[in-house]
Amino acid sequence: MFQQLTYRLRLFRRRHKYIFINSIFLSVIIIFLIYSYWSNLPAEDNSAIINEKGTYHRSLWESITMALFPPKTKPFEEKKPQVNPNNNQEVGVESGASEISQHKQQQQQQQHAKEPTTKTSSKSLVSDEAYQLNLKLINEQQEKYNRLHPFEQKRLQQGYEFFDNIFKIFYQAKPSVSQLNTYPSKKRIYHARFDSLADDDTIFSEKYLSQFLQLSNEELAAMKKSHKYVVENLPEDAPDGLYKKNGIVYVAGGSFNWLTLLSIKSLRAVGCHLPIEVFIPKIEEYESDLCNRILPELDARCIYMKNQLMNPNKDNSDSFANKFEFKGYQYKALAILLSSFENVLLLDSDNIPAHSPEELFENDPFKSYGLVVWPDYWKRATSPYYYNIADIDVSEKYLGSKYNEVEGQYTDLSVEKGSVELDKIPLHQRLGSIPDPTSESGQLLISKKTHLKPLLLALYYNLYGPSHYYPLFSQGSDGEGDKETFLAATVTLGKRYYQVAKFLVSLGHFKVPGGDFEGCGMGQFDPQQDLEYIKLREQYAKIPEKDKEKQHKFKLQHQVLEKGPEILFVHANFPKLNPWKLKQEKKIFDAKGNRVRLYGPGMIKRIGYDFEWFQWEGMKYLLCIYDVNLQIFQDVKKSDLCDEILEHLRFLESTQNITD
């Protein structure tokens, strides 16, 4: 019996010898990788992904897969600089030569800009070849996506029919009057910052706002007729199956491709796993390395506008969408509408999430309201004519809410006409009007299940925006565009919305100590924490002022009451985070040539990690390690670009301990 058992054991070992050896070998590798991963983690870490300095830590599985299947691109080798102790600037033997070559390069670029018509015929041939190549790549990518998602083709076909009907309504609702541009004088509306504390004699009352854009009776009647038609004919709901799940949408194209990629890189690094769709408006703005190689690895994909709007395999000459020319501000509403997601967070390409926005979809205020908008700096200047056109009753008896940007709150008012003079009340404090302040559309959270019709109406406003609706919303003041259309459409249709009460914060720095503040971006706050903060503040106000102990305990239990909502989005809109352009235009240098932090040293306290350093680390990863090939950097030598990124990274690292 024992001999038989021994024989079987030897037989098993001979037959499975190589499997046994391979198993031991793989086990040793995995144990080594686990040990390496844990030994490289810092002792104290605020997050599994980003630590307090903004350093990205790969997950265990990511470390294993990268070790077993390393990226094909060759890592960029960082050069160790020589440092001048007097000014912390890098110096080298060829520093003078590099300045001369840089000057020559700038002269060549300027000369090239002065001669835009040279080699026109060859450029047109290249453009035609690029068009055909991009079209082929787009179709191949879509076919691949369709194979992985069996119901996608049916969904697209549903969309083609639905959108054609929608654009038929838009076309038939075209205003019969020409552009609205009649003003009594060259004077335009005072573009005032919303400031509750300012001693401003200009009240944006109905009387004041009626002094600018003028409509004749014929124009007013025609606008009312077309608006009524579109409101009565637009559907409330989309076809079943056209939209599903939650996702994030960007509008890219051209120079915005790079900014979108940088934002997506940050989004993934802060732990957001939501799928992403990148809207490409024009075929010449499609970049194969971005759409075919990089984005799929980040669980994102490009969607080409025309192929989502009309069937590319059919003759679309009679399509109603073809009767419109799309550009600029119309892209945002189109991007939301053409995306496959039911619930959408729309982000500008230069808008970078500081933390994961994933929880916003599953909690209030979004779950209850279906639309979340964020405030902008300015007072609302919407013409009283708009409310007449949209058939909105702006009360002369009751007020709606009054906004206080210092406290970050709306106060409900219920004052009857007899106790106030309407000429002394802002129009947009009256019940029924669109509330102050204006909206900032760098981020927008919307449900197409509850707000499809407002979205369609907003698209209508944007299609006829430059000629008709932008003058009604902004009356010729600065900053007119799509930002007013989403909330205006929602108010017009009587849908719910939530406007974040916490006022945006300006982010920037002082180039000269004691000098003027130079704004470089805007910080927008977490709406979930904003709503929680409002509710807790109401509860706190009910605690008797004498009961200090109860007040203290309440604050300890609710940290958000003490700290306030946190910054969720950094809209890095001026200057854009293009590392080479920042250097060329000296945006990251002070008057003496020393490097500066764009958003100042206080960002580490505000965000919880070194946000600015982390963006430049993302640039290094994308451009120097992963070797992303984008048109925006095609005229820049990669080694020069990466040297600049590394030099600025070293500066940012050297200033991480400065927090004031």
Swiss-Prot record:
It is an enzyme of class 2 (transferase). Keywords: Glycoprotein, Golgi apparatus, Membrane, Signal-anchor, Transferase, Transmembrane, Transmembrane helix. Residues 39-660 are extracellular. Residues 75-125 are annotated as: Disordered. Glycans are attached at residue 657. Residues 1-17 are cytoplasmic. The keyword Transferase applies. It comes from the Eukaryota. One of its GO terms (molecular function) is alpha-1,2-mannosyltransferase activity. Its main location: Golgi. GO terms for cellular component: Golgi apparatus; Golgi membrane. It is a single-pass type II membrane protein. Alpha-1,2-mannosyltransferase required for cell wall integrity. Responsible for addition of the first alpha-1,2-linked mannose to form the branches on the mannan backbone of oligosaccharides. Addition of alpha-1,2-mannose is required for stabilization of the alpha-1,6-mannose backbone and hence regulates mannan fibril length; and is important for both immune recognition and virulence. Belongs to the MNN1/MNT family. This is Alpha-1,2-mannosyltransferase MNN21.
